[in-house]
Regions:
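P-loop NTP-binding module
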Residues: 1-190
Length: 190
């Protein structure tokens, strides 16, 4: 496997959220209480990481539209702001959102890697220092099967060598089995 970094042009705005969601994204202008809430979550996650060099946190929710993707982004930003080299993976290959939120192409995303269509792991750097994104890639017909194959283990082992922390945004756990594929591969679920 090879890691390919795709840099954003500085003239582009990285994040293209709806106005409502923009107010929810962690930034310098966020209210103190919001910053403090994510700092508290970050501290709790750091204490729960079992001494791992690169913890992997899987973010899910019981049902759709509970804000898990916004929380995934904010937790990843919180770790990146602390100086941790952070990778945010869009593990929702059924309804991917991170490529739209960050306006990045889906080439060589998670689905292509797990299907064996590429050996290149193409991550996109963001305007947030220390934060990179691996998109879900093109929507496959069989996400659960892809996540259950040995390439998932190889991918996670590979990214653990290059990052300090990994967050995986997954689909709702009560709707599909995809999030459970990470049970033995992750530090924990959020």
């Amino acid at each position: 496997m090879a890691l390919v970094n795709r840099n954003k042009k500085k003239k582009e705005s990285t994040v293209h959220f709806s106005k409502e969601d923009q107010r929810k994204i962690l930034c310098a202008d966020s209210p103190f209480v919001v910053k403090e809430a994510y700092s508290s979550i970050r501290t709790n996650l750091l204490f729960s990481q079992k001494g791992e060099d690169c913890p992997i946190f899987v973010v899910t929710s019981p049902t759709a539209n509970n804000g898990k993707s916004i929380n995934s982004v904010n937790m990843a930003i919180s770790f990146a702001q602390m100086g941790k080299k952070t990778l945010l993976i869009d593990g929702d290959m059924r309804n991917p959102t991170l490529h739209r939120l960050f306006s990045i192409p889906v080439k060589n995303g998670l689905s292509e890697i797990l299907a064996g269509l590429t050996d290149s792991i193409t991550v996109s750097k963001t305007d947030v220092e220390n934060l990179s994104i691996l998109t879900a890639g093109k929507i496959p017909p069989n996400p659960s099967e892809l996540l259950s194959n040995e390439r998932t283990d190889k991918l996670l082992s590979f990214v653990k060598q290059h990052y300090d922390c990994v967050f995986i945004d997954t689909p709702p756990v009560n709707l599909v089995t995809d999030p459970t594929a990470f049970a033995t591969k992750s530090t924990g679920y959020i």
